[in-house]
């Protein structure tokens, strides 16, 4: 109620704009009886000509996802990689991730972050990442915005934030001496 939303310089009501956005949620919402290959076939029907089946297959291979294994047999990290492959296969300009690395083991989290870093190397791509894991933000963010109860408290360049603020770990006695 306090403003407007623009995505890629247009309103989110524009179907052409929505087609340029990939979304990854904390949990993958695919039928567990499906296989990654079946997910790709379903999404091809949704995205139409924008869907790149060859790229999706390449992503499955890159992410070491077995195309014929049912989703219920995949680990949480593998499900997240399937979710990411599904979001990337129509080659979006903007990738929106909501707690995409939450609950993953360190190895899976690192692999997801590497994939995101590869994605943003192309300056035509952007990532909007919602996360409570500050180390993830340190690794891939250029700008960090802090929202609290729906209010934007700040949006600053990550390097400026790192220079301006820090964490002091000490006892109360040491703090009192400062």
Named regions from a protein language model:
Residues 151-177:
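Conserved beta-strand-loop-alpha-helix hinge in the C-terminal portion
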């Amino acid at each position: 109620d306090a403003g407007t939303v623009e995505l890629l310089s247009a309103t989110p009501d524009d179907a052409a704009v929505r087609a340029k956005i990939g979304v990854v949620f904390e949990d993958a919402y695919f039928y567990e009886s499906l296989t990654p290959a079946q997910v790709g076939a379903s999404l091809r029907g949704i995205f139409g000509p924008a869907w790149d089946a060859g790229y999706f297959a390449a992503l499955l291979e890159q992410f070491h996802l077995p195309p014929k294994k049912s989703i219920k047999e995949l680990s949480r990290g593998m499900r997240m990689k399937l979710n990411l492959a599904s979001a990337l296969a129509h080659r979006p300009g903007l990738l929106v991730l909501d707690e995409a690395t939450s609950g993953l083991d360190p190895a899976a989290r690192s692999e997801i972050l590497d994939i995101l870093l590869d994605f943003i190397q192309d300056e035509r791509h952007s990532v909007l990442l919602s996360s409570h894991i500050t180390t993830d933000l340190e690794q891939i963010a250029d700008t960090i915005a802090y929202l609290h109860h729906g209010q934007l408290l700040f949006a600053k360049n990550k390097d400026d934030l790192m220079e301006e603020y820090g964490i002091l770990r000490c006892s109360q006695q040491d703090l009192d001496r400062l």
